[in-house]
Each structure stands twice: as C-alpha cells, then as structure tokens.
C-alpha cells in the first residue's frame, strides 16, 4: 500500500473496484499511478496533480515518499 494519504485513499477506493496498485511516476508535478484491473488483467492509469495539495509540507512528503 502507498505511504502518503492521497494515494492511500485512491488505492483503497480502486481496490474496492477490483484494481491493484502497480507503480507510479512523478514528472513535472504530475503523479501518475498505475493500476492493474484484476478482473480483466489490463493496466490503467490515474493522474494526481500534487500541486493541488494545499500544504507545502504535504507536498514535500508526497515527493519524498514517491522518490523512495
């Protein structure tokens, strides 16, 4: 499971719909999450723009944990 809150919440919701977290990519302030549809075996993407996080501290935490 992902460590930071926004991704954790998204992951939990998508898991309820039959998706499994695979990977992420952070580029130019956009966090793209990759999921596998466990029913059909397809890979889907979800984009989260971290610039929308209001807290600078939370943004820094998102970057730090994604880079681990």
Predicted regions and their residues:
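Mixed-charge, Lys/Arg-enriched low-complexity segments
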Residues: 1-8, 56-68
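Compositionally biased, intrinsically disordered low-complexity segments
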Residues: 10-12, 25, 51, 65-66
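Acidic, low-complexity, intrinsically disordered interaction modules
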Residues: 18-61
């Amino acid at each position: 499971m992902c460590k930071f809150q926004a991704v954790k919440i998204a992951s939990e919701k998508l898991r309820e719909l039959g998706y499994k977290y695979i990977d992420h990519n952070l580029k130019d302030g956009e966090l793209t999450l990759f999921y596998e549809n466990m029913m059909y075996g397809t890979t889907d993407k979800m984009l989260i723009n971290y610039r929308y996080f209001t807290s600078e501290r939370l943004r820094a935490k998102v970057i730090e944990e994604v880079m681990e």
